[in-house]
């Protein structure tokens, strides 16, 4: 699997981007969420998911690892393909989507074009526990990153 691409942004549209990595241009499908998060800087790093089918190899790109994780979970649901997952991440942010699944909010998920009641219920049924676990994992990572380091604690103690 190609986990990320780092290089020069050649072209950016709401549905795809082209990134030049050492002379090789990669066409990467993106969501509107990723499009809105990317600045027009020349250099960028994009996290990827490579879908391999018998007729095509398709790269999907994400602004961060969290969005890629949500995408991977969505495509694990029967009846949700990569393009449907991309449309879902274009309509709702990863955090909104996660919240809707954790809170069993069928209406929010159904608001995405192409998602009916049965598919929304299947997504909630299949992913609710995984999303709760993902939430607790992310919360512990955020808490750990926000706790002061030993150096910061030592400097704070010296200031007093």
Predicted regions and their residues:
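Short acidic alpha-helix initiation/capping motifs at coil-to-helix transition points
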Residues: 64-66, 99-102, 146-152
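A short amphipathic alpha-helix within small helical-bundle interaction modules
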Residues: 74, 89, 97-101, 109-110, ...
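Strongly charged, low-complexity linkers/loops
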Residues: 125-160
């Amino acid at each position: 699997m190609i986990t990320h691409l780092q290089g020069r942004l050649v072209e950016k549209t709401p549905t795809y981007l082209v990134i030049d990595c050492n002379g090789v241009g990669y066409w990467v499908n993106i969501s509107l969420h990723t499009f809105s998060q990317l600045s027009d800087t020349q250099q960028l790093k994009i996290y990827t998911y490579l879908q391999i089918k018998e007729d095509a190899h398709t790269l999907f790109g994400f602004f961060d690892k969290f969005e890629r994780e949500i995408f991977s979970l969505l495509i694990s649901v029967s009846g949700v393909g990569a393009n449907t997952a991309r449309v879902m991440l274009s309509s709702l942010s990863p955090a909104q989507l996660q919240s809707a699944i954790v809170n069993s909010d069928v209406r929010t998920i159904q608001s995405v074009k192409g998602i009916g009641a049965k598919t929304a219920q299947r997504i909630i049924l299949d992913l609710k526990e995984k999303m709760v676990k993902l939430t607790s994992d992310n919360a512990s990572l955020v808490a750990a990153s926000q706790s002061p380091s030993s150096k910061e604690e030592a400097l704070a103690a010296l200031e007093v």
